Design a protein with these regions (language model features):
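A generic, lipid-embedded transmembrane alpha helix
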Residues: 41-55
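Membrane-interface helix-boundary motifs at transmembrane edges
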Residues: 24-36, 89-97, 155-159
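Non-cytosolic membrane-interface motifs at loop->transmembrane helix junctions
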Residues: 61-72, 98, 123-134
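Hydrophobic transmembrane alpha-helical segments in integral membrane proteins
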Residues: 1-16
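C-terminal transmembrane-bundle signature of multipass membrane proteins
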Residues: 113-119, 130-157
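Juxtamembrane "helix-exit" motif on the non-cytosolic side of transmembrane helices
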Residues: 23-26, 52-61, 115-123
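Alpha-helical transmembrane segments in multipass membrane proteins, preferentially the mid-helix core
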Residues: 76-91, 146-150
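Hydrophobic alpha-helical membrane segments
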Residues: 73, 77-81, 98-118, 137-140
């Protein structure tokens, strides 16, 4: 049994239940902007994924085929979130496309990182960075889902 997979799946289930109970039912009452901004701020912290390249944060031998794409994908997602924030704050017409770009790239990054970690057996080498896929990735996956819901149903005109 892969304990990391169990942690990732169960944490995702817990975050999904929380979103379903507390956030999704309230989306019709909330302005899209008030939901998207905190999510973008959360994802702006994905630069922490660079820990997969930091000696001491991961154990020697972590597969580079996982570590580099995961770290750099997280950095790209963080930068895209930071770029989208001012557009959302200013209610720019670019807000929706920038948030959409961030959301697609960020989601693909997480799916790729999970797949690469599984394929290359990265879990035993994660060391202190283990909390990223066990806790952080599930939270990010669920918030990406929420943004897709907003982009698909609730986003009318500029934010």
């Amino acid at each position: 049994m892969n304990i990391l997979t169990v942690n990732l799946v169960l944490s995702t289930v817990v975050f999904a239940i929380a979103a379903r109970l507390y956030l999704i039912p309230n989306l019709p009452k909330l302005e899209a902007r008030s939901v998207v901004l905190p999510i973008l701020l959360l994802h702006a912290l994905r630069h922490l994924g660079l820990m997969f390249l930091a000696p001491g944060a991961v154990l020697p031998g972590i597969p580079e085929q996982f570590a580099y794409p995961a770290a750099l994908g997280d950095l790209l997602a963080a930068v895209l979130a930071l770029v989208a924030i001012p557009a959302v704050v200013r209610r720019s017409r670019l807000a929706r496309p920038l948030v959409g770009l961030f959301n697609v790239v960020g989601t693909i990054d997480l799916i790729a990182a999970i797949s690469l970690a599984t394929f290359y057996g990265a879990a035993p080498y994660m060391g202190p960075a283990y909390w990223i896929p066990a806790f952080w990735v599930p939270a990010l996956l669920v918030t990406h889902y929420v943004v897709f819901v907003l982009l698909g149903k609730r986003w009318y005109g500029p934010m």
